[in-house]
């Protein structure tokens, strides 16, 4: 029969350096740290086996199927520069291993079991190449960047947002009041914090009602379309959809979901509902650092970002870049492009291991939020460009005169930066001067500049921003 019981080395079956990848394969780049004494070929083959058809011993039922057709293959291994005992192992998976339109199944297969594997000291999924044949089975973002701009009638600049603080403890009425002040002052959006769901001090239905009132009042006063990210995340999918239905009945433009804590199945369900009912979907990445913070173990955020674009979301938080190290800036911009663009070339300097073709799947707006204020505006405008959402929580609500003047300061700073850029001025070199000039005409901006002036404006021109 040719069946021989016993344990055999993975590399005999799953390490195939001669393999030529197919256009339909899902390709993965793993950072593998083998246990002492385990050769990299065996470690890479073990990853390929455990995340596809393999098990720890030979089983007679292998003879009932065609392993060559279904097995994952480790087809290339390269050492990580500057690290000892770390390797990038490239694995190709046949498309038939995955259920169509299911990010959940894709992750269960590729990262579900293999991370606890004894032969590995650590394992990190650095990147995935999703083939067009698989992408075409996903709806993707409910609307995408262009449709969102058309819905909001806002063009030629980044959108402005603000997370309402304190995030927990306000009553629904006071929460709605804070929303109204920010929107009236000139912001496009305000936001529920990721952990605002339906707590005893503020039940979700009350919050939705008062926020809708704030939206309609501020729209009437400013003549602009406004929105508030109403967090629909809940303990069950049914409850989540119930909240989204109520938001739609109120006529508001956008809802929100925590896609990692809520899960990909719930997220994809909500994204389908949002497309069918004309709601935009804002995605928060709460819990991402548990998965992506360690350099040698876990999943890099660029993979989670790709998964979100497949599962569906119109905005996603993607870090701020400002004040960070140069290398992190390039890597952040790498996955920002993966979210927005239709076609992204392989570029290892930006952490992009594979060329990715999104075949017309709508793009996702990256959201910069966390510790930013008016002095960062030139840097953010230059780095992120027009297709982004800039969110100032404390940078709006921390204004000495209140929320509405804080919103005015941010809007004036943004309009000044966009105008300066359109006139051909160098935001990197002249950023501070541009903000100072604008503050002469805006007492609100002048007050904001004074409050945050001791925080340095750390931004040098970067050549790799094209």
Curated annotation (Swiss-Prot):
It is found in: Plastid, Chloroplast. Binds 1 Mg(2+) ion per subunit. Belongs to the RuBisCO large chain family. Type I subfamily. Substrate binds at residues 113, 163, 167, 285, 317, 369. It comes from Pinguicula caerulea. Mg(2+) binds at residues 191, 193-194. Its cofactor is Mg(2+). Its EC number is 4.1.1.39. GO terms for cellular component: chloroplast. GO terms for molecular function: magnesium ion binding; monooxygenase activity; ribulose-bisphosphate carboxylase activity. The basic functional RuBisCO is composed of a large chain homodimer in a 'head-to-tail' conformation. In form I RuBisCO this homodimer is arranged in a barrel-like tetramer with the small subunits forming a tetrameric 'cap' on each end of the 'barrel'. InterPro entries: RuBisCO, RuBisCo_large_chain_AS, RuBisCO_lsu_C, RuBisCO_lsu_C_sf, RuBisCO_lsu_fd_N, RuBisCO_lsu_N_sf, RuBisCO_lsuI. RuBisCO catalyzes two reactions: the carboxylation of D-ribulose 1,5-bisphosphate, the primary event in carbon dioxide fixation, as well as the oxidative fragmentation of the pentose substrate in the photorespiration process. Both reactions occur simultaneously and in competition at the same active site. It catalyses: 2 (2R)-3-phosphoglycerate + 2 H(+) = D-ribulose 1,5-bisphosphate + CO2 + H2O; D-ribulose 1,5-bisphosphate + O2 = 2-phosphoglycolate + (2R)-3-phosphoglycerate + 2 H(+). The modification N6,N6,N6-trimethyllysine is found at residue 4. The modification N6-carboxylysine is found at residue 191. GO terms for biological process: photorespiration; reductive pentose-phosphate cycle. Gene3D superfamilies: Ribulose bisphosphate carboxylase, large subunit, C-terminal domain, RuBisCO large subunit, N-terminal domain. Keywords: Calvin cycle, Carbon dioxide fixation, Chloroplast, Disulfide bond, Lyase, Magnesium, Metal-binding, Methylation, Monooxygenase, Oxidoreductase, Photorespiration, Photosynthesis, Plastid. This is Ribulose bisphosphate carboxylase large chain.
